[in-house]
């Protein structure tokens, strides 16, 4: 199993914004994978650090490659445990529940690499993660395929800028595999940097970046860098996109 998604990018690689879910991927397809047997071990580990929580596996109403579960805990109590600032504790309602969504991809697209990362908090430990070019491929797949029926996900575009500003190339083979799996690309067709830029340009032209700005403001402290966001800005920075096969 490997860590991926925006939380992996924040925790392991220094993305400077808040994130929501904990996303993991199996290393190969496992149709019968079930998160439930892991619930007790996760709750026991959290309790070892003083956190009292419950974990419920989501019952799927339709066939899906994603296994989901929610870790739930009393928000105010956990803030006291971690010695949060007094004003944060007092402003938190005593009945407020914190929910952390955990998802596992049980049928990951091929053509990705992993690496081992080491962290020191809360204790020294290692964790397997998708590499940055593969994480970037996953983010672009999300940008191209996410169904924005409620709001524009500005944090996706924020991450896109982060990858470009850090000169991270996108793994084209992994991205192609993801697009094919989502029925967003014909596996018989060639896929290269030109096709990718065309797809991104099409997405940019139909994106409301004013709404994207509203969304990202929930995830970052300083919004000044988003003042430049516009269709023209994102079209221009496509020229800096790097790829690997």
Place the predicted regions along the sequence by residue.
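Structured mid-to-C-terminal alpha-helical surface segments
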Residues: 1, 12-15, 27-245
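Structural signature of FAD isoalloxazine-binding scaffolds in flavoprotein oxidoreductases
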Residues: 22-24
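Anion-coordinating catalytic cores for phosphoryl-, nucleotidyl-, and glycosidic chemistry
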Residues: 19
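Glycine-rich beta-strand-to-loop/alpha-helix junction loops that act as flexible
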Residues: 4-7
């Amino acid at each position: 199993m490997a860590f991926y998604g925006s939380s992996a990018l924040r925790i392991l690689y220094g993305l400077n914004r808040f994130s929501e879910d904990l996303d993991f991927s199996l290393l190969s397809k496992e149709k019968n994978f079930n998160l439930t047997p892991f619930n007790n071990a996760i709750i026991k580990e959290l309790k070892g650090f003083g956190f009292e929580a419950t974990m419920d596996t989501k019952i799927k109403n339709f066939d899906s490659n994603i296994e989901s579960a929610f870790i739930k805990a009393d928000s105010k109590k956990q803030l006291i445990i971690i010695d949060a600032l007094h004003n944060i504790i007092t402003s938190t309602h005593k009945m407020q529940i914190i929910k952390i969504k955990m998802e596992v991809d049980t049928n990951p697209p091929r053509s990705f690499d992993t690496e081992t990362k080491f962290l020191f908090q809360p204790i020294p430990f290692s964790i397997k993660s998708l590499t940055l070019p593969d994480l970037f491929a996953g983010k672009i797949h999300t940008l191209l395929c996410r169904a924005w029926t409620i709001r524009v996900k500005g944090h996706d575009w924020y991450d896109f800028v982060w990858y470009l500003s850090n000169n991270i190339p996108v793994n084209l083979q992994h991205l192609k595999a993801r697009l094919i799996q989502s029925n967003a690309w014909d596996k018989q067709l060639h896929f290269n940097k030109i096709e990718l830029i065309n797809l991104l340009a099409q997405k940019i032209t139909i994106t409301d970046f004013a709404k994207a700005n509203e969304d990202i403001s929930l995830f970052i402290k300083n919004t000044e860098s988003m003042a430049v966001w516009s269709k023209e800005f994102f079209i221009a920075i496509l020229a800096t996109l790097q790829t690997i096969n």
